[in-house]
Amino acid sequence: MSNGIVIIGSGFAARQLVKNIRKQDATIPLTLIAADSMDEYNKPDLSHVISQGQRADDLTRQTAGEFAEQFNLHLFPQTWVTDIDAEARVVKSQNNQWQYDKLVLATGASAFVPPVPGRELMLTLNSQQEYRACETQLRDARRVLIVGGGLIGSELAMDFCRAGKAVTLIDNAASILASLMPPEVSSRLQHRLTEMGVHLLLKSQLQGLEKTDSGILATLDRQRSIEVDAVIAATGLRPETALARRAGLTINRGVCVDSYLQTSNADIYALGDCAEINGQVLPFLQPIQLSAMVLAKNLLGNNTPLKLPAMLVKIKTPELPLHLAGETQRQDLRWQINTERQGMVARGVDDADQLRAFVVSEDRMKEAFGLLKTLPM
């Protein structure tokens, strides 16, 4: 018997897809298989759990059972998919197998842990499950080292600092958020973190970790070291592509899909953090929401290409929040920065004075939507 549409994964992308399919078709068989509990939680909340004193279980919004009942689903939680036989259209686990008409990979991305000696001492906060495994250690830690000064690293540094912990943030780059924007734009947040007491070790490298009687000794370059109680890796995500590779699909950084979210196999699609859409990996909520709307139509036979507009990315650092959009990482833009007490507006323009990117902060974030309309599609 066919299971209709089979989805591997249960995160934000999978749930958005289920909701969009059920808006259009209440009865088509939907089967979800995932390695976790399949309980729903809001992943961005993980950046604020420590300052808000939340336990992992506090994050649960809907149990797997409630989800299955609400949307008429067949759920297989705590189930590891071991293989996909694309020719036979069968998904396999150790004890089970599922025939599919259409298969969707929504396997997400895993936290990258730098390959240094003692890397097993590093914690990651990429899921409710990961937080559950280390919440006691993080709650009890007085001194925390965050490895990586990107979006998640900056959010976590502020959160741990707000919780009264001694926070050190280390990054190879000369400024925070270096892969997202130039230093003259990120400097406002960088100064705020420093004012709050975050110890920034920029242009610095972690070389190894070692357990000691009183904590963890982190060895750095230039013969430096620091002792802490917990180390968190915030060095980016890697799309989960192992299953797709075993199915013989085309892989680059993520699972390669076209504008219809279709992989190199006509009956297999990919969505969310694991997908590379026409060469782009977009691990943000808005592109996932739009992709799920389009994919639901395509799975139900209404072929619709994905057209992504200019979209906002939000950096959730409550003491100095930022919104950004456009090609903020472009090296050839000229930045026009207007800073006032209530916030900043930074406009990145090209040689023709065309707005290509912007970053806004604090009370001036309300200007984001007007700027968004002037960005080229």
From Swiss-Prot:
Q: Which UniProt keywords apply?
A: Cytoplasm, FAD, Flavoprotein, NAD, Oxidoreductase
Gene Ontology molecular functions? oxidoreductase activity, acting on iron-sulfur proteins as donors, NAD or NADP as acceptor
Name the cofactor(s).
FAD
Q: What cellular-component terms does GO give this entry? A: cytoplasm
**What protein does this entry describe?**
Nitric oxide reductase FlRd-NAD(+) reductase
| Annotated catalysed reactions | 2 reduced [nitric oxide reductase rubredoxin domain] + NAD(+) + H(+) = 2 oxidized [nitric oxide reductase rubredoxin domain] + NADH
Q: Lineage, please?
A: Bacteria, Pseudomonadati, Pseudomonadota, Gammaproteobacteria, Enterobacterales
State one Pfam family annotation. Answer: Rbx_binding
Primary site of residence: cytoplasm
Q: Which pathway does the database say it acts in? A: Nitrogen metabolism; nitric oxide reduction
Gene transcribed to yield this protein: norW
User: What EC number(s) does its UniProt record assign?
Assistant: 1.18.1.-
Protein task = One of at least two accessory proteins for anaerobic nitric oxide (NO) reductase. Reduces the rubredoxin moiety of NO reductase.
Cell location: Cytoplasm
Family according to the record: Belongs to the FAD-dependent oxidoreductase family.
